[in-house]
Amino acid sequence: MKRILSVACGLLALVGFGLVGGLGAGTCSAAVKLKVGASPTPHAEILKEAAPLLKKKGIELVIVEYADYVQPNVALNNGDLDANYFQHKPYMDDFNKQKGTKLTAMAFIHYEPFGMYAGKTSSLKDLKKGAIVSVPNDTTNEARALLLLKDQGLIKLKKETLDVTRLDIVENPMGLKIEEIEAPQLARSLPDVDFSIINGNYAMLGKLKVKDAVATEANDSLAAATFANVIAVREGDENRPELKALVEILKSDALKKFMIEKFEGGVVPAK
């Protein structure tokens, strides 16, 4: 009898929560588990804020934190996660191409402005020839850093697209030395470089605030329109009701308010 009840509860959990108000009370009290990989900041913090709202819908959110940009995609593709939340679509698309994974963006949740932070040099007006600027070493985020340098008038590029590399620099009047560093290490590189262009989440982990950056991406820039962070899932899972419920809550007014107030400009809700 217990086995029959358990199976029945499982079936009800799959069809009875989410967009129509959650699981019913009574004997079927077991929550559906939803396992989501995330960067510690801000993604895991945002998910923790969403967890109680999901619980009301009969969904237990299990958050798995990752310190890098590779393992959460590997784990999702292998079926160890139901979704992940740490990356933008260009990075995910490039990862799919490079690794042969089959991941897709289910929804755009928020945008993290890239910031250029002072290291050994305190402001752009004090910039000297041969200054060292550290940038992310992955393809899409390095392009984003180069576009920010271009927007500050520090370099000129032969094209202004999201696949630019250092080879596309046609003018570098200050002779900037651009060093590629793994994104998680950028904040730590500040004592050794003049400036570092840092991903929003790693800037926050390094206790850096967007308001203190010497330059940031504009909210109406190409980057802002392109690099919103997504809920990524395996291809074919887009219609799972528990994932739809997660997206609905992350895009709710309550979560948007949390992002704005908690992160002070470091996290901008996606439109």
Residue map of PLM features:
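Periplasmic-binding protein-like
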Residues: 143-150, 250-270
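Short helix-initiation/N-cap motifs at beta->coil->alpha
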Residues: 63-74, 161-188
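Ligand-binding "clamshell"
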Residues: 94-106, 121, 192, 197, ...
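A bilobed periplasmic-binding-protein/Venus flytrap-type ligand-binding module shared by bacterial periplasmic
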Residues: 113-124, 227-240
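Short, low-complexity disordered leader/linker segments with a strong preference
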Residues: 1-33
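Beta->alpha turn/N-cap motifs
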Residues: 65-69, 79, 83-93, 109-110, ...
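Short, well-ordered beta-strand elements
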Residues: 30-41, 59-65, 132-133
